[in-house]
Swiss-Prot record:
SUPFAM superfamilies: FtsH protease domain-like (SSF140990), P-loop containing nucleoside triphosphate hydrolases (SSF52540). This is ATP-dependent zinc metalloprotease FtsH. Zn(2+) binds at residues 451, 455, 527. The active site is at 452. Binds 1 zinc ion per subunit. In the central section; belongs to the AAA ATPase family. In the C-terminal section; belongs to the peptidase M41 family. It is a single-pass membrane protein. The keyword Protease applies. Acts as a processive, ATP-dependent zinc metallopeptidase for both cytoplasmic and membrane proteins. Plays a role in the quality control of integral membrane proteins. Homohexamer. SMART domains: AAA. The chain crosses the membrane at residues 135-155. It is an enzyme of class 3 (hydrolase).
Length: 651
C-alpha cells in the first residue's frame, strides 16, 4: 500500500521536464511574433469551415481525440491545442537557430478569452474539453499495477475457494487424534489405585500383541470395553496407558466431536473414523465422554430423528459390523452409564464394563506415591497418614492435593514439602482457602463459635458419629466456620444408628444456637438441607421408616432427555406422600432432640470449647479430646482418631 501511494503521488505531481512553461507575457509575445510552429505555412487561410466566435478558423476534433502534435505527440508542427477544462494551451514553438521545435504549455487565467486572442492573431487552434492532466497521467501510470493486483486477487480468490471447497469436503471427516510416538508415553506403571481395571485392560494389550494365544483356545476377544466411574478416577488415564503399552495406533476422540449442526455430519465422521481404523488395524479407538452421543434414543426434541440419534445409529452399526478378527478394539469412558442406550451396552459392542471406583486406602497410598514421585518431601511427611485422612478422594483430588501442597511450600519459600503443607492442602481441597481478611462482627464470631462447638461436641459424644478432626471459625470458602470429621476406615455402607448420629451431628449447630442464645440464625441452612436429604433417603430408599416399612418410593419412569434423573414421577398416593413428610419430620426432630439433650447436659463443655475457639480460632482433635475428658458429663468410650480428616462440615 505504501509503494502504491508513493507511485500515485509521483504520478499526480510529476511534470514533463521537456515542456517549456510560458507565462502570460511570453505567450502574448509569441502570439504577436507568430512564434508557433504551425506547419509548412505560418498563416491560415481566411474563412472556411469551423469559424470561431470572431469568424476566424477554429478546427474542432471529437472529444477525447487530439490531432497529431502537442503534448504526447511526435513533435510534428500543427495547430495549437486549447483545453477548456484545464485552461491550458499546448503546441510547438519555432526552433531558434535550427533544431527541433520546442513543446510549450501555457495556463491562462480564469475568464481569459483565449479563442478571441488566437482568432484575432489568425492562429489556427483546436479545442478539446478533455484534459490530459495529472489524473490521466496517474491512470496511465497505475494501470499496469492495477492489472497485477487484480490478477493476484483473482488467484487468491480461486485458491480460497478451493480451500473452502476442501474444508467442506473435510467437514465430514473424523476429528479423531492419533497418538504418535513423539507424544509423552503413559504406561500402566503410571496408573495406581485401580488394579482390577489394569488387569482387565492388560488382556486387551496381550490380545493386540499375541492374538493367537486366545484364538487357539476358541476365545473371542471383547470388541469393546466401557470404563465406568465417578469423575476424576482415572478412566482417561487408563485409556492412555493402554495406548502407551499396546504399541498400536490409538485414535482418541470426544463424544461431542461427532455431533454438529449439519445433518449427517456425525454419521459421516463415524464412518470415516472406522475406515481409518480398518486401514491401521490392529488399533484402538477411544471415545471419551461417550454419553454425549450415546444417550438412550427416542427422548429428544427431534422426534427420534435428530442428528445425535443418527450418529448413534451409525456408531451401533459400525461397532457390530466390522470383523471381529480385524483387531479393532473400542474403548469408551463415561460417568453416566445409566443414561446410555441399551443397544450400546449389549454384548458384541461393549462386552465389558470396567468399573473404576474411588480408591481405597491401599489405592490412595499408591496414588500419593505416584504423584509425590520426583518431589522433595520433608522427613515428617507420612504418606499413609495422608491417605487415611483422605477417604473418598479420587485420583484427581489427590493429584490436586499434592500440587496445592507444593504451591504452599513455594509460597513459604521452603525447599521441601512438609506435613504442615499437606494438612493445609487437605483443608483447602475440602473447604476452600482461608479467608482471614473477611471481617465479621464480634457477635457473629461468637455465634459461629458456639455453632461449630455444637457440631464438634455432638460428634465427639455420639459413639456412632465419625471422629472430629478439627474445628475452626476461620472463614473458608463460603462458610464462616468449619467442623471436619472423617470415618475411621473406608466405609461402603451405613447402619441406621450411624445415619441418625449423622443427622444429630448436622443439627448440633442449630441446637447450640437455641441452647445458648435462645435464638436461631440462617447459619444452619446448609445443615438443615443436608439433614432433610439424608432423612428422605432413609424413608424412601433405604426402608428405614417404621411406619412405611421395607418399600422404595419414587421410582423413575425412564425419561432420559437431559438425563434419567431429571424426571421422576411419584408412584405413590397423596396419603403416602403425607406419611413420607411426617416420617422425615419425625426423624429430623428425633435427631435434633438428641443433639439438644447432649448440649444441655454438657453446657460447661460447650462454653469452654466456644471460648477456646474465640481465643485460638482453631481447635484440633487432641485439644478437643482433652476438653471432653475434663468437662464431659457422660463421655462415651474414646476411639482412636487419625491425625487428619476429609468430611468437612460447613456450618
Amino acid at each position: 500500500m505504501i509503494v502504491f501511494a508513493t507511485i500515485l503521488f509521483g504520478a499526480l505531481s510529476a511534470e514533463d521536464p521537456d515542456v517549456e512553461k510560458l507565462d502570460s507575457q511570453e505567450f502574448q509575445r509569441a502570439v504577436e511574433e507568430r512564434a508557433f510552429a504551425l506547419g509548412p505555412e505560418d498563416h491560415a487561410p481566411a474563412g472556411g469551415e469551423g469559424q470561431g466566435a470572431a469568424g476566424h478558423r477554429e478546427l474542432r476534433h471529437p472529444v477525447g481525440r487530439a490531432p497529431s502534435g502537442g503534448a504526447g505527440s511526435d513533435l510534428e508542427p500543427g495547430p495549437l491545442k486549447v483545453y477548456d477544462e484545464s485552461q491550458k494551451v499546448t503546441g510547438l514553438l519555432k526552433p531558434e537557430g535550427g533544431g527541433e521545435p520546442r513543446e510549450f504549455e501555457y495556463s491562462y487565467p480564469e475568464g481569459y478569452d483565449i479563442a478571441r486572442v488566437l482568432n484575432e492573431a489568425n492562429i489556427p487552434f483546436t479545442t478539446d474539453p478533455q484534459t490530459a492532466g495529472p489524473w490521466a497521467r496517474a491512470i496511465a501510470v497505475m494501470a499496469p499495477f492495477v492489472l497485477i493486483l487484480l490478477l493476484f486477487f483473482l488467484m487468491t480468490r480461486t485458491g480460497r475457494s478451493a480451500s473452502q471447497s476442501s474444508r467442506m469436503t473435510d467437514f465430514g471427516k473424523s476429528r479423531a487424534r492419533r497418538m504418535t510416538k513423539d507424544q509423552p508415553k503413559v504406561t500402566f506403571a503410571d496408573v495406581a489405585g485401580a488394579d482390577e481395571a489394569v488387569q482387565e485392560l492388560t488382556e486387551i494389550k496381550e490380545f493386540l500383541e499375541n492374538p493367537q494365544k486366545f484364538q487357539k483356545l476358541g476365545a473371542r476377544i471383547p470388541k469393546g470395553a466401557l470404563l465406568v466411574g465417578p469423575p476424576g478416577t482415572g478412566k482417561t488415564l487408563l485409556a492412555r496407558a493402554v495406548a502407551g503399552e499396546a504399541g498400536v495406533p490409538f485414535f482418541s476422540i470426544s463424544g461431542s466431536d461427532f455431533v454438529e449442526m449439519f445433518v449427517g455430519v456425525g454419521a459421516s465422521r463415524v464412518r470415516d473414523l472406522f475406515e481409518q481404523a480398518k486401514q491401521n488395524s490392529p488399533c484402538i479407538i477411544f471415545v471419551d465422554e461417550i454419553d454425549a452421543v450415546g444417550r438412550q434414543r427416542g427422548a429428544g426434541l427431534g422426534g427420534g430423528h435428530d442428528e445425535r440419534e443418527q450418529t448413534l445409529n451409525q456408531l451401533l452399526v459400525e461397532m457390530d459390523g466390522f470383523d471381529s478378527k480385524s483387531g479393532i478394539i473400542m474403548l469408551a469412558a463415561t460417568n453416566r452409564p445409566d443414561i446410555l442406550d441399551p443397544a450400546l451396552l449389549r454384548p458384541g459392542r461393549f462386552d465389558r464394563q470396567i468399573v473404576v471406583d474411588r480408591p481405597d486406602l491401599p489405592g490412595r497410598i499408591k496414588i500419593l506415591k505416584v504423584h509425590t514421585r520426583g518431589k522433595p518431601l520433608g522427613e515428617d511427611v507420612d504418606i499413609e497418614t495422608i491417605a487415611r485422612g483422605t477417604p473418598g478422594f479420587t485420583g484427581a483430588d489427590l493429584a490436586n492435593l499434592v500440587n496445592e501442597a507444593a504451591l504452599l511450600a513455594a509460597r513459604h519459600n521452603k525447599e521441601q514439602i512438609e506435613m504442615a503443607e499437606m494438612e493445609e492442602a487437605i483443608d483447602r481441597v475440602i473447604a476452600g482457602p482461608e479467608r482471614k481478611t473477611r471481617l465479621i462482627s464480634e457477635k457473629e464470631k461468637e455465634i459461629t463459635a458456639y455453632h461449630e462447638a455444637g457440631h464438634a461436641i455432638v460428634g465427639a459424644l455420639l459413639p456412632e458419629a465419625d471422629p472430629v478432626h478439627k474445628v475452626t471459625i476461620i472463614p473458608r470458602g463460603q462458610a464462616l466456620g468449619v467442623t471436619m470429621s472423617l470415618p475411621e476406615e473406608d466405609r461402603f455402607m451405613m447402619s441406621r444408628a450411624q445415619l441418625m448420629a449423622q443427622l444429630s451431628y448436622m443439627l448440633g449447630g442449630r441446637a447450640a444456637e437455641r441452647v445458648v442464645f435462645e435464638e436461631i440464625t440462617t447459619g444452619a441452612s446448609n445443615d438443615i438441607e443436608r439433614a432433610t436429604k439424608v432423612a428422605r433417603q432413609m424413608v424412601t430408599r433405604y426402608g428405614m421408616s417404621e411406619k412405611l416399612g421395607l418399600i422404595a418410593l419414587g421410582q423413575h419412569d425412564g425419561q432420559v432427555f437431559m438425563g434419567r434423573d431429571l424426571h421422576a414421577q411419584p408412584d405413590y398416593s397423596d396419603e403416602i406422600a403425607f406419611q413420607i413428610d411426617k416420617e422425615i419430620r419425625r426423624l429430623v426432630d428425633e435427631a435434633y432432640d438428641t443433639a439438644e439433650d447432649l448440649l444441655v447436659r454438657n453446657r460447661r463443655l460447650l462454653e469452654k470449647l466456644a471460648s477456646d475457639l474465640i481465643e485460638y480460632e482453631t481447635v484440633d482433635a487432641e485439644h478437643l479430646r482433652r476438653l471432653v475428658e475434663e468437662y464431659a458429663v457422660d463421655e462415651h468410650p474414646s476411639r482412636g482418631r487419625p491425625a487428619m480428616s476429609v468430611n468437612g462440615h460447613r456450618g
